């Protein structure tokens, strides 16, 4: 399941190379904001120490440990939307190669999304940490489903605030703050009203990287959200 990560893995040799690549990715992300690869690589290069902290939190949790051992992946092969949509409504996950649920499948189908669109981690030097960051990117859509937020600019920014508070990743922090300035006046006011609750949920809920989504077979979405203290 890590073949793509291994084949794509290109750790940078020294701090100078890391800084120069970081600078180039930042320029490209600014010049070509619709190209997700540049922003993704910027997140990798700026989030190394934060990813190490996330890895430690996973090691200190029994479920997180199992995720690190099993290294499950979110791919079109493991998350077949057409199969997910056959499950009972209001469920979230199913075991084996189906995983997830009607809610997640509907979310992906209605928006014409594919889990294969997530760029593969490239620059994080340690392969174990590269997996951790890849896992974060691959469960991002699950967070949308759990928080009940869509994929408009406003909704994406709200999710980024949650991720910033939960994970502390620089890329999430940058997206949360910079993205907020791009909202119109009405959306900014709505965000100000929403933020206290989102930050509260981020602080009280289970650490999202320690959730083994693939093991929630036919779990009712509301029950799952309750168990994760998201309600």
From Swiss-Prot:
Record membrane topology: Peripheral membrane protein
Enzyme Commission numbers on file: 4.1.1.130
Query: EC top class, in one word?
Result: lyase
Database matches in Pfam families = Coq4 (PF05019)
| Key words, A-Z | Lyase, Membrane, Metal-binding, Mitochondrion, Mitochondrion inner membrane, Ubiquinone biosynthesis, Zinc
The UniProt annotation places Zn(2+) binding at 140-141, 144, 156
In terms of superkingdom, the source organism counts as Eukaryota
- InterPro entries noted in UniProt: Coq4 (IPR007715), Coq4_euk (IPR027540)
UniProt subcellular location: Mitochondrion inner membrane
Q: What are its GO cellular component terms?
A: extrinsic component of mitochondrial inner membrane
Presence of the UniProt keyword Transmembrane helix in the record? no
According to its UniProt entry, the protein's GO biological process terms are: ubiquinone biosynthetic process
| Catalytic activity as recorded in UniProt | a 4-hydroxy-3-methoxy-5-(all-trans-polyprenyl)benzoate + H(+) = a 2-methoxy-6-(all-trans-polyprenyl)phenol + CO2
The cofactor named in the record is: Zn(2+)
Q: Say where the protein is mainly found.
A: mitochondrion
According to its UniProt record, in which pathway does this protein act?
Answer: Cofactor biosynthesis; ubiquinone biosynthesis
Q: Which family does it belong to?
A: Belongs to the COQ4 family.
Q: What is noted besides the main data? A: This protein may be expected to contain an N-terminal transit peptide but none has been predicted.
Question: How is the quaternary structure described?
Answer: Component of a multi-subunit COQ enzyme complex.
Q: What does this protein do?
A: Lyase that catalyzes the C1-decarboxylation of 4-hydroxy-3-methoxy-5-(all-trans-polyprenyl)benzoic acid into 2-methoxy-6-(all-trans-polyprenyl)phenol during ubiquinone biosynthesis.
Q: HAMAP family in the record, alphabetically?
A: Coq4
Q: Which protein is depicted?
A: Ubiquinone biosynthesis protein COQ4 homolog 1, mitochondrial
């Amino acid at each position: 399941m890590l073949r793509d990560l291994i084949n794509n893995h290109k750790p940078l040799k020294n701090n100078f190379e890391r800084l120069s690549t970081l600078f180039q990715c930042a320029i490209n992300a600014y010049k070509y904001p619709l190209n997700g690869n540049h922003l993704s690589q910027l997140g990798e290069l700026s989030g190394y120490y934060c990813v190490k902290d996330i890895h430690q939190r996973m090691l200190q949790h029994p479920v997180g440990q199992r995720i690190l051992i099993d290294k499950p992946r979110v791919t079109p092969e493991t998350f077949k939307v057409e199969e997910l949509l056959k499950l009972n409504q209001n469920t979230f996950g199913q075991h084996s190669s189906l995983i997830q649920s009607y809610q997640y499948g509907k979310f992906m189908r209605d928006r014409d999304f594919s889990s294969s669109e997530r760029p593969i981690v490239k620059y994080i030097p340690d392969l174990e940490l590269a997996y951790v960051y890849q896992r974060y990117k691959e469960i991002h859509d699950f967070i949308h489903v759990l928080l009940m937020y869509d994929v408009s600019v406003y909704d994406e920014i709200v999710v980024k605030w949650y991720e910033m508070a939960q994970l502390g990743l620089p890329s999430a922090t940058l997206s949360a703050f910079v993205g907020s300035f791009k909202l119109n006046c009405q959306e900014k006011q709505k965000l100000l009203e929403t933020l206290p609750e989102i930050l509260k949920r981020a602080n009280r809920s289970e650490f999202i990287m320690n959730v083994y989504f693939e093991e929630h077979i036919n779990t009712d979405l509301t029950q799952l959200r309750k168990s994760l203290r998201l309600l």
